[in-house]
C-alpha cells in the first residue's frame, strides 16, 4: 500500500526536476528564436527597400538645396524625386499587402457566398491529359493558376513568387508590381543623373569639395543608383513586354521544356537533392537558401507542389497502351531498374520523338491568351485611364475564365488535323501505331472436321447462325484448311518505332486463301505484261491435263464395252473361268490406268484373298 504513493511522488519529482524543465524551456526558446529569425529573413527585403528608397530621397533633397554649378539641380529636381519616391513606395506597399488572389476562400465558412461561383475555362491540362487539380489545396486549378509552396496556396494568374515582396505576384497585385518597377526605375535614373552630374562638375572644376573630401553620400548615390537602374530597367522592360503579350513569367519560361532540356535537368537536380542517397547533399541552411530561389517560379525551376511529378524514365505521352504495358510488366514501371537494352532504347527513342514533336508544335503555336497589345494592357490596367498611374486594382476578369486567342485555336485545330493525317498515313503504310478504336475485325477461315461440328448448348432446337462471309467462300473453305502465313520476328527498328513487321503494304496478305492484291507486272502505260516463263508453265500444265483426260476417256470406253460383253459381270471372279480376273488384270480387282486387259497367265494365279475381295463385289447379283 505504501509503494504506490512512493512511486507517484518519485515520478512527479522526476518530471519536475530542474534538468527536465530547463531542457523543455530551451526547446521552446529555440523554436521561438527560429520563428523570429525566419520572420526577420522574410521581411528583411521590405526593410531594405524602404530604407534604400528613403535614403535616396533624402540625398536628392539635400542635393537640390546645395549650391552647385549644375543649373538644373534646384527645387524642381527635389520635387520630382519626392513624387517618384512616394509613388514607388505606395505601389510597393500595395503589392506587398494585397492578396494576389487564390482559388480557395481565405475566410472558410465565416461568410456565406453572395454570388454564384465563376465558370472556369480549361484550355490547359496536366501532362497526362487530366484536369488540373491541386492536392495541397484540394481544389481545382483554373488556367494560369499555380500552387506556391512558400505562400501555401494556389495563386490566380500567378506570375512568380517575388522574395523582395515576400509574396506572390498574381491577378490582384500584378498592376501594382509593374507600376513599382516603372517608378523605381525612373527614380533610380533621376537620382543617378543628379548625383553623377554634381560629382562630375565638382571634380572637373577642382572646387573646395575635392580638397575637403566632398560628401560621400553623393558618390554612393551615383554608383548605387546607376547599378540598380541598369538591372531594374532591364527587368522592368521585360515585364512590360510580357504584359503587352498577355504572358506571365511562368508561361514564358515553361516553353524551355520544349526548346531545351533545361526544365528536365532542373527537375532531376531537384529530385536528387531531396532524395537520400542521390546527388550531393547540401547543408541544411544551404538547401533552404537554394529552395528559396527555386520556389520563385514553381513548375519551371522545381516541380510544382500539388501535382504529380513527370516521370523521367518513362515517356511523357498520354498513350493508354503504354500505361497498360507498364502495369502488366513490372520491368517498365517507374522507379524500376530491371530494364533490358531493347526496352531502354525503345523508351529513349519514343521520348526523343515526342520531344521533337512537342518542339515543332511549340514553335507553331502562339500564346493561348494573347489578345493583342491593346487588349492585353487594358486587361491589366483597366478601362479607366485616370486610374492607370495609381496602384488600384482595376484588372478585368476573375481569374477563372479566360478568353482564348483565336489564332491559337486555329493553330491548335490545324496541328491536330496534321497529327491525325500523319497517323492515318502511318497506319496505311503499315508501320504506324494501331488505333484501338478503328480496328476492323478480319475473318480468318479455319477448317473443322465434319465429325467435330457439334452445335453448342444442350437439348432443344439449334439454328444455324448466319455467317459474315459469302456462300461461295463458305463452300470453298468448308472442306479445305486455310493457309496461315508465318509471323516475322520484329526487328530493332520495329521495336523502336512500335510497328508490326507483319503489316507492310508491300506484303501479300492472304484472305480466304487468295491474295487481296494481284501481283502482276505492268508496263509504263499500265498494261499487264506477259512473261515467257509463265506462258511455258501454263503450256506444260495444259499438256498434262490433256493426256490425263484422254487416258481417262479411253479407260471409260473400254469399261463400257466389257460391261456389254459380260452382261455387267466383267469384274466378277465367279466360276472357274476367272473372267473377272482376266478382265481386271490384277488381283483384288484393281484396274490398270493404261490398259484394262492383262496377260492371261496372271489370272490363274489368284489366291484366296483375291477371291474374297472379288466375292465382296458380287453382293445383290444372282
Curated annotation (Swiss-Prot):
Composition bias type Low complexity, residue spans: 466-488
Q: Where is the composition biased (Acidic residues)?
A: 533-547
Give membrane topology per the record.
Multi-pass membrane protein
Q: Where is the composition biased (Basic and acidic residues)?
A: 302-311, 419-428, 610-622
Region of interest (Disordered), ranges: 298-334, 419-507, 533-622
This molecule's function is given as: Palmitoyltransferase specific for vac8. Palmitoylates vac8 at one or more of its N-terminal cysteine residues, which is required for its proper membrane localization.
Identify this protein by name.
Palmitoyltransferase pfa3
Amino acid at each position: 500500500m505504501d509503494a504506490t504513493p512512493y512511486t507517484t511522488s518519485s515520478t512527479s519529482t522526476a518530471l519536475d526536476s530542474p534538468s527536465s524543465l530547463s531542457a523543455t524551456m530551451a526547446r521552446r526558446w529555440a523554436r521561438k528564436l527560429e520563428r523570429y529569425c525566419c520572420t526577420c529573413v522574410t521581411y528583411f527585403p521590405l526593410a531594405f527597400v524602404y530604407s534604400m528608397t528613403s535614403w535616396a530621397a533624402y540625398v536628392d533633397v539635400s542635393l537640390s538645396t546645395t549650391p552647385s554649378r549644375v543649373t538644373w539641380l534646384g527645387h524642381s529636381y527635389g520635387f520630382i524625386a519626392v513624387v517618384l519616391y512616394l509613388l514607388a513606395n505606395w505601389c510597393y506597399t500595395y503589392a506587398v499587402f494585397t492578396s494576389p488572389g487564390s482559388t480557395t476562400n481565405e475566410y472558410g465558412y465565416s461568410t456565406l457566398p453572395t454570388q454564384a461561383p465563376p465558370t472556369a475555362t480549361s484550355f490547359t491540362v496536366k501532362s497526362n491529359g487530366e484536369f488540373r487539380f491541386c492536392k495541397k489545396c484540394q481544389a481545382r486549378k483554373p488556367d494560369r493558376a499555380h500552387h506556391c509552396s512558400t505562400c501555401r496556396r494556389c495563386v490566380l494568374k500567378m506570375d512568380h513568387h517575388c522574395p523582395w515582396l515576400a509574396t506572390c505576384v498574381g491577378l490582384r497585385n500584378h498592376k501594382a508590381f509593374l507600376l513599382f518597377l516603372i517608378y523605381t526605375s525612373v527614380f533610380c535614373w533621376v537620382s543617378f543623373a543628379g548625383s553623377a552630374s554634381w560629382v562630375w562638375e565638382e571634380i572637373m572644376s577642382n572646387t573646395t569639395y575635392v580638397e575637403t573630401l566632398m560628401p560621400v553620400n553623393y558618390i554612393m548615390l551615383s554608383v548605387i543608383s546607376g547599378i540598380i537602374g541598369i538591372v531594374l530597367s532591364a527587368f522592368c522592360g521585360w515585364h512590360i513586354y510580357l504584359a503587352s503579350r498577355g504572358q506571365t513569367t511562368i508561361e514564358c519560361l515553361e516553353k524551355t521544356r520544349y526548346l531545351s532540356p533545361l526544365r528536365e535537368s532542373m527537375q532531376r537536380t531537384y529530385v536528387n537533392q531531396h532524395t537520400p542517397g542521390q546527388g550531393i547533399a547540401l547543408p541544411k541552411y544551404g538547401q533552404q537558401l537554394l529552395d528559396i530561389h527555386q520556389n520563385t517560379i514553381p513548375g519551371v525551376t522545381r516541380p510544382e507542389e500539388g501535382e504529380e511529378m513527370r516521370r523521367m524514365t518513362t515517356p511523357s505521352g498520354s498513350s493508354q497502351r503504354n500505361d497498360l504495358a507498364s502495369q502488366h510488366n513490372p520491368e517498365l514501371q517507374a522507379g524500376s531498374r530491371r530494364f533490358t537494352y531493347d526496352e531502354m532504347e525503345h523508351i529513349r527513342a519514343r521520348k526523343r520523338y515526342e520531344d521533337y514533336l512537342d518542339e515543332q508544335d511549340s514553335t507553331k503555336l502562339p500564346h493561348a491568351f494573347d489578345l493583342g497589345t491593346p487588349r492585353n494592357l487594358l486587361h491589366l490596367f483597366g478601362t479607366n485611364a485616370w486610374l492607370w498611374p495609381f496602384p488600384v486594382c482595376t484588372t478585368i476578369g476573375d481569374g477563372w475564365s479566360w478568353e482564348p486567342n483565336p489564332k491559337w485555336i486555329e493553330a491548335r485545330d490545324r496541328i491536330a488535323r496534321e497529327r491525325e493525317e500523319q497517323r492515318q498515313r502511318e497506319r496505311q503504310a503499315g508501320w504506324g501505331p494501331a488505333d484501338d478504336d478503328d480496328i476492323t475485325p478480319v475473318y480468318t477461315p479455319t477448317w473443322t472436321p465434319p465429325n467435330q461440328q457439334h452445335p453448342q448448348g444442350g437439348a432443344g432446337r439449334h439454328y444455324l447462325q448466319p455467317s459474315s462471309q459469302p456462300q461461295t467462300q463458305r463452300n470453298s473453305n468448308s472442306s479445305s484448311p486455310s493457309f496461315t502465313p508465318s509471323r516475322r520476328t520484329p526487328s530493332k527498328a520495329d521495336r523502336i518505332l512500335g510497328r508490326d513487321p507483319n503489316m507492310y503494304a508491300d506484303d501479300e496478305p492472304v484472305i480466304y486463301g487468295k491474295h487481296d492484291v494481284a501481283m502482276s507486272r505492268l508496263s509504263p502505260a499500265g498494261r499487264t505484261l506477259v512473261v515467257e516463263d509463265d506462258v511455258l508453265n501454263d503450256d506444260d500444265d495444259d499438256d498434262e491435263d490433256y493426256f490425263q483426260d484422254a487416258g481417262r476417256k479411253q479407260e471409260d470406253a473400254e469399261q463400257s464395252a466389257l460391261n456389254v460383253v459380260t452382261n455387267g459381270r466383267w469384274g466378277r471372279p465367279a466360276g472357274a473361268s476367272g473372267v473377272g480376273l482376266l478382265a481386271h488384270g490384277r488381283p483384288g480387282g484393281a484396274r490398270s490406268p493404261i490398259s484394262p486387259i492383262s496377260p492371261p497367265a496372271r489370272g490363274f494365279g489368284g489366291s484366296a484373298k483375291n477371291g474374297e475381295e472379288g466375292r465382296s463385289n458380287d453382293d445383290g447379283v444372282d
